Structures are given as C-alpha cells and as structure tokens.
Amino acid sequence: MLQLLLAVFIGGGTGSVARWLLSMRFNPLHQAIPLGTLAANLIGAFIIGMGFAWFSRMTNIDPVWKVLITTGFCGGLTTFSTFSAEVVFLLQEGRFGWALLNVFVNLLGSFAMTALAFWLFSASTVH
C-alpha cells in the first residue's frame, strides 16, 4: 500500500510540474484559449488512453506503474479545475464565444485523444 501511495505522490507531482511548465510556455501565446492547459489535457488524455490499452493487455505489469502513470501523472497533468476557472474568466470578460470554444475543444479533444490512444495501442503488437 505504501508503494502505491508513493507512486501516486511521485506521479502526481511530476504531472503537476509538467502542467505548470506547459502553462508557462504556451498560455501566453493566445489571449482567449489557454493553450498550455489545452495541451496538458490533450496529452494527458492520450497518455491515459495508451495506458489503459497497454495495462488491459499486459496483466503482468506491477500495479505501482499503473497508478504512477494513470492516477498520479495523468491526474497531476490534466486539470479540470484550471480549465473550469479559465472558462469562468472568459465568461466574466464577456468572451462567450471563446468560452464555448474552449469547452468544446477541451472536452471533445480529450475524448478524441483518449479514444485514439486506446485504439492505437490496443491494436499494436507491443508487449
């Protein structure tokens, strides 16, 4: 149990730092769409789809790796709270179209990336 807790802790910290770095680098590039948050959510969705595909096929992987990557890293990397706050800020600024676009791209993009990764890595022969 302690190993699992440490895996979530380490993965979560690493994912959070990665999200912060993405936000620092890419959010300033566009006024209305926080590109760093979008990148974090899409990358995290892809990684979790890939992880679920691999872990469902490779049952001999230590559960520590599963929680490190999915619950830890992807949980720290992706962020519904930051995404929600950014949408609220756009709404407060009266940028309703941008807020709606942000919701649309984050949600559908994340679903699409998870499905794509699951499909790609379920079909692969990597063991």
From Swiss-Prot:
Cystine pairs: none
NCBIfam families: crcB (TIGR00494), PRK14196.1 (NF010792)
Gene: fluC
Binding site residues for Na(+): 75, 78
GO molecular function: fluoride channel activity; metal ion binding
Designated name of the protein: Fluoride-specific ion channel FluC
Superkingdom field: Bacteria
Membrane-topology annotation of the record: Multi-pass membrane protein
Keywords noted in UniProt: Cell inner membrane, Cell membrane, Ion channel, Ion transport, Membrane, Metal-binding, Sodium, Transmembrane, Transmembrane helix, Transport
Record's catalysed reaction(s): fluoride(in) = fluoride(out)
Family: Belongs to the fluoride channel Fluc/FEX (TC 1.A.43) family.
Keyword Cell inner membrane assigned: yes
Protein localization: Cell inner membrane
A GO-annotated cellular component: plasma membrane
Function: Fluoride-specific ion channel. Important for reducing fluoride concentration in the cell, thus reducing its toxicity.
Species annotation: Shigella flexneri
Membrane-spanning segments: 4-24, 35-55, 71-91, 103-123
Upper lineage: Bacteria, Pseudomonadati, Pseudomonadota, Gammaproteobacteria, Enterobacterales
Activity regulation summary: Na(+) is not transported, but it plays an essential structural role and its presence is essential for fluoride channel function.
GO biological process, one term: cellular detoxification of fluoride
